[in-house]
């Protein structure tokens, strides 16, 4: 979901939680219940209670996950948010090592980890993150929108990971 158009990921901003909930509802109405709907909010909320308040407003829209709801260093907040909402929490695109990913899975209690093959140390390190996530019952949705090579690497990574239902990428044009 892109809050501000025309469908440019770089313009994503949430000015009002009610507007966010309305956008989620309108997207759900547009695509129907059969379509998987995810929302990347680009670290929109500064604390878990604010994120929870907004997510509670759109709970019935059945988001598959909410991506990057809080600053990546707020693992305690991610943990509390993950425990308090039905929507899966997802993060990891900015993490630099497998160890940061492991810590985010454990301390952040995330439902979906999103390693970026180009940032986390390549395919081998990303695969280690995937294996760890699978062992912990965490889904993997690799983050990638830099290049065709990165998308190909993420696609190959996802093919080796049972817990990987999707990859994230940003096409040149929407």
What kind of feature is each model-predicted range?
Residues 1-80, 84-85:
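Metal-dependent enolase-superfamily TIM-barrel catalytic cores that perform enediolate-based chemistry
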Residues 56, 62, 73-174:
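Shared catalytic-loop signature of beta/alpha-barrel
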């Amino acid at each position: 979901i892109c809050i501000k158009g025309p469908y440019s990921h770089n313009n994503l901003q949430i000015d009002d939680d009610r507007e966010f909930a309305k956008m989620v509802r309108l997207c759900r109405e547009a695509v129907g219940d059969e379509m998987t709907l995810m929302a990347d909010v680009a670290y929109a909320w500064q604390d878990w209670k604010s994120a929870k308040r907004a997510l509670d407003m759109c709970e019935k829209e059945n988001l598959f996950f909410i991506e990057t709801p809080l600053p990546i260093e707020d693992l305690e907040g991610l943990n509390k948010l993950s425990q308090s909402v039905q929507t899966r929490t997802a993060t990891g695109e900015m993490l630099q090592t497998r160890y940061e990913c492991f810590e985010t899975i454990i301390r952040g209690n995330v439902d979906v980890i999103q390693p970026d093959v180009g940032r986390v140390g390549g395919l081998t390190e990303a695969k280690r993150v995937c294996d760890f996530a699978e062992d912990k019952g965490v889904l993997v949705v690799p983050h990638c929108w830099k290049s065709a090579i990165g998308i190909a690497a993420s696609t190959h990574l996802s093919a080796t990971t049972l817990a990987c239902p999707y990859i994230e990428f940003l096409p040149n044009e929407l």
